[in-house]
Amino acid sequence: MTHPDRANVNPGSPPLRETLSQLRLRELLLEVQDRIEQIVEGRDRLDGLIDAILAITSGLKLDATLRAIVHTAAELVDARYGALGVRGYDHRLVEFVYEGIDEETRHLIGSLPEGRGVLGALIEEPKPIRLDDISRHPASVGFPLHHPPMRTFLGVPVRIRDEVFGNLYLTEKADGQPFSDDDEVLVQALAAAAGIAVDNARLFEESRTREAWIEATRDIGTQMLAGADPAMVFRLIAEEALTLMAGAATLVAVPLDDEAPACEVDDLVIVEVAGEISPAVKQMTVAVSGTSIGGVFHDRTPRRFDRLDLAVDGPVEPGPALVLPLRAADTVAGVLVALRSADEQPFSDKQLDMMAAFADQAALAWRLATAQRQMREVEILTDRDRIARDLHDHVIQRLFAVGLTLQGAAPRARVPAVRESIYSSIDDLQEIIQEIRSAIFDLHAGPSRATGLRHRLDKVIDQLAIPALHTTVQYTGPLSVVDTVLANHAEAVLREAVSNAVRHANATSLAINVSVEDDVRVEVVDDGVGISGDITESGLRNLRQRADDAGGEFTVENMPTGGTLLRWSAPLR
């Protein structure tokens, strides 16, 4: 018997139950397809994250690592612009690595971000920030002129253990959509790997720098053990420090009187410079009171500065600086200054500690060289005294005996010519004895000869320099080895140079440096109007002749910044 309802169903149409089953199957297939697409997309993004992590951890150079982090982060989330801001010790941005902005636009924008606005919010509170419209954030301060428009934003801190190294900034997702939760998770994972990569790169650079520091210290020590003059130490310190820090310039300032106690030093003089700095800075004086350099010298404490209160000329504008005392036992030999250009980041704590240790080791080498020089001088003086005693006790006495014998024999000579020859020989013996006595006197006067030269030069300055002319004098090296002839030359050179500065240059300051190494050097720098050709040919001809007579060199030139630089040198005899 057929059911009445079933009899009314159209035999050609599918049953209702079958239709519903097909609909559910279609929905299930679509859901499965979506899930598969999500799985594939997730796998692709995970593969992209792994590739990004491998890319940023493959190198050990810090600059290259920072750029790799920015590039891979932008690629990972399809961001048009990316940047990494490095935080300094005072939470300011000290370095800003960017991608997506061409150099022409970068030049039009001007200075790099300093950490204001939304960037500053991430610096003050280092946690992820994701914005659909950056302009709507309460901390937003807008963009500078010529800056490309940016709307979507994703910022994530980069940490090295408990330290926030910097922040990773990404803007303008390529499809115009806002950054998603998945984007944030991926960038956070990348930032974690970036912290490890940066830490490894920093450790590698620190190890290389420490190796260079050890090598530089060894080089200085080797030079000192080889008998280098203490004046050479400061030149080595400046050159090695410049190489270590890869900075713009270095300089060394020491007391005007290296024998005065540190508490009695009022001024320091810059005796050595290296790098991109004007040679005119050499011999510049720096007051101990009221200056950064003087404060470090007085306190014997290494310090760093964002900008040094010292006007120095050079091709680059000086910026961050390290000021390091050259400490040796209970003395301070001077101050070492390392300068970076104004557009470079400040020095770090680790760099300060490392360079302070280098300065201490260098000062110890200077102390060793000074002690060796003093010991050599004592040995020389001891030998002089011994030779003088031998000459007096043996040679002169024997010559006297010979002379007395000849005096007794002369009257008995019958031939007049022989008698005259004997008397002539007696006179020669008297002259020889007198010359030996003079030599003995010079040998005994050896310790005071340096003092005599210094006294003679100081006397010249006192006689010729006028009160309105600010004059500084620096003596370096063993003046005790300068003989009388060279001392006379040095006095004449200084007299002529100071006289010209007073009479012709209209100078207000005069810097004098007298040094003794393998030769005697006299340098005189003034800030006057320069020297004309006629004065050079007439008034300075004598100095050129003195240099020729002594086998040395003489130059005089106008400096680009104004004033005159006079150099005279002659080899030691």
Curated annotation (Swiss-Prot):
Induction (UniProt): Expressed during aerobic growth, it is not further induced in hypoxia, or by nitric oxide (NO) or carbon monoxide (CO) treatment. Expression is not changed in a devR deletion mutant; i.e. it is not part of the dormancy regulon.
- Name the chemical reaction catalysed here: ATP + protein L-histidine = ADP + protein N-phospho-L-histidine
Q: Can you quote the record's cofactor note?
A: Mg(2+). Both Mn(2+) and Ca(2+) can substitute Mg(2+) ion in the autophosphorylation reaction but not for phosphate transfer to DevR (DosR). In another study Mn(2+) and Ca(2+) substitute poorly for autophosphorylation. In another study Mg(2+) or Mn(2+) are required for transfer, but Ca(2+) does not substitute as well.
Instruction: Please tell me, according to the UniProt entry, what happens when changing G85E.
Output: Heme iron oxidizes more easily
The alphabetized UniProt keywords are: Cytoplasm, Heme, Iron, Kinase, Magnesium, Metal-binding, Phosphoprotein, Repeat, Transferase, Two-component regulatory system
Residues reported to bind heme? H147
The cross-references to Gene3D superfamilies, in alphabetical order and at most eight, read: 1.20.5.1930, 3.30.450.40, Histidine kinase-like ATPase, C-terminal domain
SMART domains reported in the protein's UniProt record: GAF (SM00065), HATPase_c (SM00387)
Q: Which GO terms describe its molecular function?
A: ATP binding; calcium ion binding; carbon monoxide binding; heme binding; magnesium ion binding; nitric oxide binding; oxygen binding; oxygen sensor activity
Which BP terms in the Gene Ontology apply to this protein? detection of hypoxia
Q: What is its EC number?
A: 2.7.13.3
Return the broad EC class: transferase
Region of interest (ATP-binding domain), residue spans: 451-573
Chain positions with Phosphohistidine modification? H392
**Domain annotation Histidine kinase: ranges:** 380-573
Q: Which residues form the GAF domain?
A: 61-198, 229-366
Q: Which Pfam families match?
A: GAF_2 (PF13185), GAF_3 (PF13492), HATPase_c (PF02518), HisKA_3 (PF07730)
Cofactor(s) it depends on: Mg(2+); heme
According to the record, what happens upon gene knockout? Cells lacking this gene show no changes in gene induction following hypoxia, or exposure to NO or CO. Another publication shows a slightly reduced response to CO. Cells lacking both this gene and DevS (DosS) have no response to hypoxia, or exposure to NO or CO showing both proteins are required for the hypoxic, NO and CO responses. 30% decreased induction of the DevR (DosR) regulon during anaerobic growth, 50% decreased induction of the DevR regulon upon exposure to NO during aerobic growth.
GO annotations of cellular component type: cytoplasm; plasma membrane
User: Can you say where in the cell this protein is located?
Assistant: Cytoplasm
Q: What does this protein do?
A: Interacts with the two-component regulatory system DevR/DevS (DosR/DosS) involved in onset of the dormancy response. Required for full induction of the DevR (DosR) regulon; required during early adaptation to anaerobiosis, to start induction of the DevR regulon. May act as a direct hypoxia/oxygen sensor. O(2) acts as a switch, with the Fe(2+)-O(2)-bound protein inactive in autophosphorylation. Autophosphorylates under anaerobic but not aerobic conditions, binding of NO or CO has no effect on autophosphorylation. Binds a number of gases; O(2), NO, CO. May be a secondary sensor for CO.
| Swiss-Prot/TrEMBL domain comment | The isolated ATP-binding domain (residues 451-573) crystallized as an asymmetric, domain-swapped dimer without ATP.
Entry-linked PANTHER family:
NITRATE/NITRITE SENSOR PROTEIN NARX-RELATED, OXYGEN SENSOR HISTIDINE KINASE RESPONSE REGULATOR DOST
Q: What is this protein called?
A: Oxygen sensor histidine kinase response regulator DosT
Tell me what organism the protein belongs to: Mycobacterium tuberculosis (strain ATCC 25618 / H37Rv)
Q: Which gene encodes it?
A: dosT
